[in-house]
């Protein structure tokens, strides 16, 4: 039986509380760049970054892949069933405390096992939610978001809200209903929808419009129920182009924004964007962040990175300073993430199987984003790119360009202007110069 909250559980015995020691430190269990109380642009690093630990990769993943068995050595995994669920809560909050992580996130099936019926499943969930609530009461950690796992169980083989089976649609609705109740009880600042099975494998047996309509109906029902129970957290939808489905409906930021606007959901949802999902969609992470930002729909981030040589969702910990800098540049330009945060939807490699590797990995990710924050803030403060962009588009601030932006031009006037204009002169975009400046800031700030 897992020990009670009051007992001295110590799953990470070799790890003390991780503190900031600075870049000269050689201690692998210390922050080199993440100084939670350092003030940058009027806010502390902790306030800017709002780090969150993902329950699924950190406490439930066992290292199984399609070619091999589990490798992870977890001191809580000798328990079974509900005892295992309780032990994971103990391990989670020990790690949250040692990393001083302000937030965490989970799927419903991460924290409690399914029972033989929906009623039994909900009872299991209630027990663990009660335990988590007790631990949260005695700590400073908050729930960034929770969500429903509607992709693992075989009942979701054809999807959840987009299933061809109305019984499955009803089950999914019941599961999200419970998820929203859990969000309210635990004070989740957001609720996430990720439709891993919401898509299709072939159009030969798919009514695409009907499935999209049903998905929208489902989302509206969720909005209505949140209002009914007075849950006020931000709804987030997470794009991904494929895996496990061949074609997922919320392919990328642009596709998801179009869906939200088409079905009148854009006032209720923002986007939870993941770096590895961006690369799977053929985009850079900063592209997805910019696309959401300019539409006013950037809500939260799943912080990770994909392997450039692999074509699937590798969910590596984010250590690429180039990427973290450009991500934080977009987040700062957005005025922050509001109720969102940087959730480490990342897993240690299968060969990094010892418990301490979980801590090393989170330190690496937190330091990488802390460094990215400082560089991005300095880039914005110095107007490195803003001045270049302003100069590049200056032709639209006067003359015919100003007439275009003010709506005073039409095809007739533009044709006349083009006929009279004898010369068109373009200027270099100077991409290489800008990349060199970016490298200089990353190395020197």
Curated annotation (Swiss-Prot):
Q: Which residues does the record give as Mg(2+) 1 binding sites?
A: 238, 274, 302, 345
Instruction: Please list the residues that make up the active site.
Output: 107, 110
Superkingdom of this entry's organism?
Bacteria
Q: What is its EC number?
A: 5.3.1.5
Name the chemical reaction catalysed here.
Answer: alpha-D-xylose = alpha-D-xylulofuranose
The UniProt note on the cofactor reads as follows: Binds 2 magnesium ions per subunit.
The record ties this protein, via PROSITE patterns, to: XYLOSE_ISOMERASE
The entry's keywords: Carbohydrate metabolism, Cytoplasm, Isomerase, Magnesium, Metal-binding, Xylose metabolism
* Stored InterPro entries: Xyl_isomerase-like_sf, Xylose_isom_bac, Xylose_isomerase
Q: Please give the HAMAP family that the UniProt record associates with this protein.
A: Xylose_isom_A (MF_00455)
> Could you tell me which PANTHER family the record lists for this protein?
PTHR48408, XYLOSE ISOMERASE
For this entry, the protein name equals: Xylose isomerase
Q: Which gene encodes it?
A: xylA
